């Protein structure tokens, strides 16, 4: 999977710009606040129909403009395909092959990306919410079924929380509606939990040998999925559903008193253990960086296995955060197989030989100077 061209109109600090992309490595050089990260963000946004930096799409529109447009031509095993995202202050529109997609679940997955930025260290040391978002973003790119199940779960969760709040405030008395919502809630909670558990298992199988290679077999990495709803995965679907319903039924009064759902995938977490110790609590900064790097490289391999093509890798000012050995391991792993976009303030310290003669672009005040 390669991005041949990227065209932006009124995106962030860009007026109109076209980037003809190198199939291997593209290095975007420039001082801070010139637009390097905006370019990477536009590729991410084109892939996932949302930015990783803001939840407000209006911020993506250039100052004093009415709209923003991102368009990319994608090469993949079946040929080429244009993807378009049009953003206005009222909403957004996405197209595949010039055909509008009515649902984002139909759109996401055509262009797969893996982003690695300094803030991705928060996957290890940050809050559970960050790790849940990590699962949803990566798993959502390779499974439209998961995206749909997650959307249904979030819809029912919102309805259930609204009803619990009304019960707490005494605006509602009837628990029958809560029981109905719990039934629907349990069904999609089980589906989301099942898919997350499988994803973490697959990711761990790929991350373990990568981590061992980076540390010269001195450290062993393990990933542990910590679901809020704990049930026996070996049971059949009906038995698992019954087990979840039992948990929800036993805690119905607690949830009513609190006015919020206390159990479900929205409260899941993951732990990353290095040599049997929780990396979030006990890991050094170096161990946390190695863990994050191992996870990102495992994501790349997992997407290739599931989709049949390597994703595009976005490295946002991250090489400066890695020491020489980690940087070399990253670059040697991706060379010749993963199209990569790198932002940096300087090419000093980047091994050009390993990066296979990259194409350099200088970014200055929203303009690309080759």
Curated annotation (Swiss-Prot):
Keywords: ATP-binding, Cytoplasm, DNA damage, DNA repair, DNA replication, DNA-binding, Nucleotide-binding, SOS response
GO molecular function: ATP binding; single-stranded DNA binding
Localization terms from the record: Cytoplasm
Gene3D superfamilies: P-loop containing nucleotide triphosphate hydrolases (3.40.50.300), RecF/RecN/SMC, N-terminal domain (1.20.1050.90)
Coarse class of the protein's main subcellular location: cytoplasm
Annotated binding of ATP, by residue: 30-37
Role according to the record: The RecF protein is involved in DNA metabolism; it is required for DNA replication and normal SOS inducibility. RecF binds preferentially to single-stranded, linear DNA. It also seems to bind ATP.
Similarity comment: family membership: Belongs to the RecF family.
Protein name: DNA replication and repair protein RecF
Gene this protein is translated from: recF
